[in-house]
């Protein structure tokens, strides 16, 4: 399993994402922290920041932006993906500062992408829901879905492949076409339980078990 960071480092990243967004919404400036954990400067993993609005016991997507193959280093990728999630996701209006107490932050650290160069009919065996995220590319089209999306939606492997194709604005069966490139990756995911409260590491396989009950 891909787990490059400790829980303490994950907490730092989630709190960083929140504090950067708060500063940006308050002052319109991007604040770079002093003396961050050294590994976050030395590493350069893909990073996505997800922001969700708390709706009772449910969570509604508020924004999600990231860098599949990194940006400068993990620290900078977290900072700029957080700003993107709050204010640059084209699906949503920019966040307002007063929303901060009603949203949770989640930071996903992505492993390097691995191209599946095999018979597409074998993808149903090679792709594992609860472990893998997907990237689909064909020509100018591309789409990415994080591994937690398939778990949250209780998708089968085939449904996951179909939805990733659709995310790329391609036919749902694009994964069966050899012109389509399919990449898998893993993610280490850190998340707030409640707005600005405890940060934990998600166990997607444990969450997936609830889909099967």
UniProtKB/Swiss-Prot annotation:
Domain AMMECR1: 8-201
InterPro entries named among the record's database cross-references: AMMECR1, AMMECR1_dom_sf, AMMECR1_domain, AMMECR1_N, AmmeMemoSam_A, Uncharacterised_MJ0810
NCBIfam families from the UniProt entry: AmmeMemoSam_A (TIGR04335), TIGR00296 family protein (TIGR00296)
Matches recorded under PANTHER family: AMME SYNDROME CANDIDATE GENE 1 PROTEIN, AMMECR1 HOMOLOG
Protein name: Protein Pars_0011
Organism: Pyrobaculum arsenaticum (strain DSM 13514 / JCM 11321 / PZ6)
């Amino acid at each position: 399993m891909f787990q490059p960071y400790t829980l303490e480092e994950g907490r730092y990243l989630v709190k960083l994402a929140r504090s950067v967004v708060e500063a940006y919404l308050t002052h319109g400036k991007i604040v770079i922290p002093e003396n961050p954990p050294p590994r976050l400067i030395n590493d350069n993993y893909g990073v996505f920041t997800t922001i969700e609005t708390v709706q009772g016991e449910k969570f509604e997507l508020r924004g999600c932006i990231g860098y599949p193959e990194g940006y400068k280093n993990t620290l900078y990728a977290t900072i700029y993906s957080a700003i993107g999630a709050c204010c640059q996701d084209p699906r949503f209006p920019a966040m307002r500062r007063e929303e901060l107490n009603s949203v949770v932050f989640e930071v996903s650290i992505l492993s390097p992408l691995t191209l599946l160069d095999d018979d597409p009919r074998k993808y149903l065996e090679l792709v594992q829901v609860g472990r893998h995220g997907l990237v689909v590319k064909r020509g100018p089209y591309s789409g990415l879905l994080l591994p937690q999306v398939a778990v949250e939606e209780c998708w089968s492997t085939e449904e996951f492949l179909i939805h990733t194709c659709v995310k790329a604005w391609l036919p749902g069966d694009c994964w069966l076409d050899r012109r389509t490139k399919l990449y898998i990756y893993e993610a280490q995911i850190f998340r707030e339980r409640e707005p600005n409260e405890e940060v934990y590491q998600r166990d997607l396989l444990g969450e997936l078990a609830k889909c099967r009950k």
